[in-house]
A protein has these predicted regions:
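N-terminal alpha/beta PP-like core and its mobile active-site loop of ThDP/TPP-dependent enzymes
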Residues: 20-27, 38-180
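Extreme N-terminal leader/targeting regions
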Residues: 5, 14, 22-28
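N-terminal secretory signal peptides
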Residues: 1-13, 39-41
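Exposed alpha-helical structural elements
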Residues: 3-4, 31, 175
Length: 180
């Protein structure tokens, strides 16, 4: 489905091809149409509804934290990591979203998974880029249990790519594609 949505938004396929692809992937007609309707405003040439846009002030971290709060989340599970500083700074100004510190990325995903199962709410977590491989086993567990998780990872600035080659992944999405 991710590839179909990407192809639709990139104007590589038509609406008809998108719906046919969704049907081939065993989605019902109603589910395929619902998916199309949710991404239609992002197709080049489409008009964006006013309720899809808003003005924001602050940093990108503030925007991310505010978006998480708008989902009704109360907790953001975090692990140690250098790229998380701006988000943690933003949490100081947004006390309605409480950070829960995990000591390892794998534990972070397991804790967010357990929280989601116990509360019935989506678990949100964020970890540093080197933690992505460490977190993948528990991402697999959450995927198998169909637990709703939203996980964020920082990434190196493009001008710094390759300076810590032992920590860089060539394709971030490819590493976790089976679980998302």
């Amino acid at each position: 489905m991710r590839d179909l949505v990407d192809d639709l938004i990139s104007a590589k396929i038509s609406r008809r091809q998108f719906l046919a692809g969704m049907s081939a992937a065993s989605f019902t007609t109603a589910a395929a149409q619902s998916a199309f309707d949710s991404v239609a405003p992002f197709i080049p040439g489409s008009e964006m509804p006013e309720n899809y846009m808003r003005s924001v002030t602050g940093t990108g971290a503030d925007l991310l934290v505010e978006q998480i709060i708008e989902t009704g989340a109360e907790y953001l599970f975090v692990s140690n990591g250098s790229g998380l500083g701006p988000v943690c700074d933003s949490l100081v100004d947004h006390p309605q979203l409480q950070p829960i510190q995990a000591t390892h990325e794998g534990q972070l995903v397991a804790i967010a998974d357990g929280y989601a199962k116990a509360s019935g709410k989506t678990g949100f977590g964020m970890f540093s880029r080197v933690g992505l491989p460490h977190s993948s086993s528990n991402m697999y567990n959450a995927m198998k249990d169909r637990t709703p998780l939203v996980l964020f990872s920082d990434h190196a600035d493009p001008d710094r790519m390759g300076t810590d080659s032992h920590e860089d992944l060539d394709d971030w999405l490819e590493a976790v594609k089976p679980y998302t």
